[in-house]
């Protein structure tokens, strides 16, 4: 957290604001947060903040996973054709790769790549990417919220079990605005136990385990909660049975650790490998 313009106030005010922000973050579940008091005009704290951000950028990215990129823009360039942009959530992509474009449900070949405004031969998770793609799709058929994927996906999810991190308590079957990557839809929440809930989506989403979502009130004025995907397409009945809830709690606890998550899925049934 960067506290800006600290040269404009007394040191006591800086500490007061820091304590307020720290308390708010603690209530939201962020217990260990780095604070950087800064004053750009005086070059105070800038070097420390820059060093911290560079360290964050060097953290390992999920490049061994399948490539997933959420599209937020599509346009045409004279002499090149269709170009789409978005942020890669996982995996990596190279010029010449063939990716699956949802929405039009067709394969597209990557003819060119730009990452962070530079022409590159490959790009990876965490980067903003522009892809010049070639295939049986026109710009008018490509929409914000479509995905480029390394392989044809299973059907999008209409219902999903999530782990909630609430800023404001939610009520049973409350209507919500739901944000996921570049998608914005509506749906309802069915509370299960503790911080577990089922989201029933008005429009299916291309989700994966551990994806993050933002939940806002139906007037779209207030952010109510964050959510993390625990499992997709839950059973329509029996979600409140003790054994199923126990399984969900165990699955939520392992987070993004693939090996124990796979073991838990195998305890219940076969695993779909698409």
How does the language model describe each region?
Residues 4-5, 89, 201:
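A secondary-structure boundary/capping signal
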Residues 1-31:
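Conserved C-terminal guanine-recognition region of P-loop GTPase G domains, centered on the G4
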């Amino acid at each position: 957290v960067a506290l800006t313009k600290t040269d404009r106030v007394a040191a006591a005010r800086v500490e007061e604001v820091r304590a307020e922000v720290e308390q708010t973050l603690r209530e939201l579940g962020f217990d260990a947060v780095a604070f950087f008091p800064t004053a750009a005009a005086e070059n105070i704290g800038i070097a420390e903040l820059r060093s911290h951000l560079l360290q964050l950028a060097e953290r390992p990215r999920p490049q061994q996973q399948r490539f997933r990129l959420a599209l937020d823009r599509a346009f045409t360039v004279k002499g090149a054709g269709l170009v789409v942009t978005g942020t890669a959530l996982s995996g990596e992509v190279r010029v010449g790769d063939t990716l699956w474009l949802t929405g039009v449900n067709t394969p597209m070949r990557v003819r060119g790549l730009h990452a962070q405004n530079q022409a590159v031969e490959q790009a990876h998770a965490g980067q903003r990417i522009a892809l010049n793609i070639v295939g049986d799709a026109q710009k008018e058929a490509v929409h914000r919220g479509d995905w480029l994927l390394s392989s044809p996906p299973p059907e999008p999810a209409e219902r999903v079990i999530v782990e909630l991190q609430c800023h404001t308590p939610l009520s049973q079957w409350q209507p919500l605005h739901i944000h996921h990557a570049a998608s914005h839809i509506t749906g309802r929440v069915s509370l299960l136990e503790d911080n577990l809930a089922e989201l029933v989506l008005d429009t299916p989403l291309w989700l994966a385990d551990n994806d993050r979502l933002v939940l806002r009130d139906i007037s779209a004025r207030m952010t109510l909660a964050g959510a993390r995907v625990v499992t997709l397409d839950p059973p329509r009945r029996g979600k409140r049975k003790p054994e199923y809830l126990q399984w969900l709690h165990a699955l939520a606890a392992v987070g993004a650790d693939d090996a124990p998550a796979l073991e838990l899925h195998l305890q219940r049934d076969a695993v779909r490998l698409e």
